[in-house]
Amino acid sequence: MTVSTFNRTWAKVIVNALLRYGVKHFCIAPGSRSTPLTLEALQLQQNQQAQCHSHFDERGLGFFALGIAKVTNDPVAIIVTSGTAVANLYPAVIEASLTHHKLIVLSADRPPELIGCGANQAIPQQGIFADYPIAGVNLPKPAEHYNAGWLVATIEQACVTQSQQGGVIHINAPFAEPLYEADENAIGTHPWLKPIQSWLINPQTKWINSQTIQSEVSMHENWDYWRTKRGVIVVGKLPVEQGIGIKAWAETLGWCLITDVQSCVDANLPYADIWLSNNTVHQRLLQADIVIQFGGQIVSKRVNKFLEAFKGEFWQVDEYSDYLNPFAHHQTRFVAKAHHFLRVHPPLRQKPWLLEPLALSQFCAGFIEQQVGGSLNEASLAHHIEEVLATSGNLFIGNSLFVRLVDALCKLPEGYPVYTNRGASGIDGLIATMAGVAKGSGQPTVGVIGDISALHDLNSVSLLNKISHPCILFVINNSGGAIFDMLPVEAQAKEQFYRLSHNYEFAPIATMFGIEYIRPFTWADLKAKLKLAYGRKGVTIVEIKVNDQDGSNLYKSLVKQISQAEIA
């Protein structure tokens, strides 16, 4: 058998191991060294066993894969060639690692004899992602003296680790030339495959049958005591299914419920980021005996300040075993899904122990509406974001100012899926992630990002052409990084080194990539054009051009005025 044919046979085993693990999507960047992996992934697509996606920019491709992984909860494979192509996946690897989404990086490599000798496009790739992957596999150059069963077992063992912990696997696969002109008829019939032939012909068969670790949570030994006390529940980022029941549980206990925009839990005390600026309410909330926090990655600065200031009994509930304790609490930690925790901690019906947050939250609803006004701007879009969403769809929110405005000013429908990149909270790859969420879900998706984020990920506008159902990408153009208006930095330095003001507009970008584009000036105009956009099969870019400091100024004004409100 020729080298090129055995390369393909070796790659066939790798991609089939991933198929049996649950990979349904292969995201592929162009490259020569990865040809064996690419062609075998395409073979799965031709057999209608998987979908293949392509993109010319590995950084965007990584985030596109992350978006698919977010919405499907399935592992997603990424195939790239050798060299800096691998390094371009680093931001997506970091984000997926911190949020436990399952990415599998398949990096093709030069064979060992070409590393460290000046060969073209050859860099040390083993361990390139440092400690971010939860499993790393550095395969040898394909050779028949390695047992085929060993190759399957090596891949599947890494997958078993990922199935239990989430996160990223890095599989580095060297291939020697030649890479082309393989004997297609010999790829699947080589005697080397004989030990795994029954596995290979049955897509449902796994080489390693591992049982998922069952970590049943037990009721806290003092729950009967703590459920009679004054409590506050804080809900951070949660999957939709885990948020079900938290609101009713909190209301039965009579405890205050504070929810993050990523929680997918209906807020009975919305606008917490605003009303917690009031020191009287903040201090009364600190009189709680116990705080229970579900999930993490909380957006609100004032909610985080409350958590930092609280010194009582603190319980943290999260399905992963990561150390979540930014404020060094003496805490009790439950490694459990939220709904599993609720099941074994039945509530005791009590009257609410603190009414001021409810009263101030209700006041904020009318006050915010009055302050935001009827103009179309970033604050009013955040406050009324529900009005631009599809009935059954997704919301993807970028980072920086807008996610804070949504968290502070809006009340989303119960259980509406919200996606973010709040693991490392970077602005890279946001368009690509939104495209992945839309592609992976097949549902109408609204994404909202800032202008600097859009400029940072401009290549990924190309990915929007892969979406064939109605989706809306809002670009809030405040001519720079408005989030930095919140910083106490001297004006000239802020302008030149933080804000980076510009005069760019996004209509020419939409034209270049062949994407529908609208620029509304009023809410009536927006709603009329959105009706048309939701009737199209594809993505529409909506540019909202706003004054550079309006959003940040309104945000600061709301916080200041509520902080000064008199509370009896």
Swiss-Prot record:
Cystine residue pairs: none
EC number: 2.2.1.9
Keyword entries, A-Z: Magnesium, Manganese, Menaquinone biosynthesis, Metal-binding, Thiamine pyrophosphate, Transferase
Signal peptide: none
Claim: Cell inner membrane is one of the keywords in the record: no
Details of cofactor binding: Binds 1 thiamine pyrophosphate per subunit.
A molecular function (GO) term: magnesium ion binding
Catalyzed reaction equations: isochorismate + 2-oxoglutarate + H(+) = 5-enolpyruvoyl-6-hydroxy-2-succinyl-cyclohex-3-ene-1-carboxylate + CO2
InterPro entries per the UniProt record, alphabetical: MenaQ_synth_MenD, MenD_middle, THDP-binding, Thiamin_PyroP_enz_TPP-bd_dom, TPP_enzyme_TPP-bd
Domain of life: Bacteria
Cited Pfam families: TPP_enzyme_C, TPP_enzyme_M_2, TPP_enzyme_N
Protein family: Belongs to the TPP enzyme family. MenD subfamily.
This protein's name: 2-succinyl-5-enolpyruvyl-6-hydroxy-3-cyclohexene-1-carboxylate synthase
Phylogenetic classification of the source organism: Bacteria, Pseudomonadati, Pseudomonadota, Gammaproteobacteria, Pasteurellales
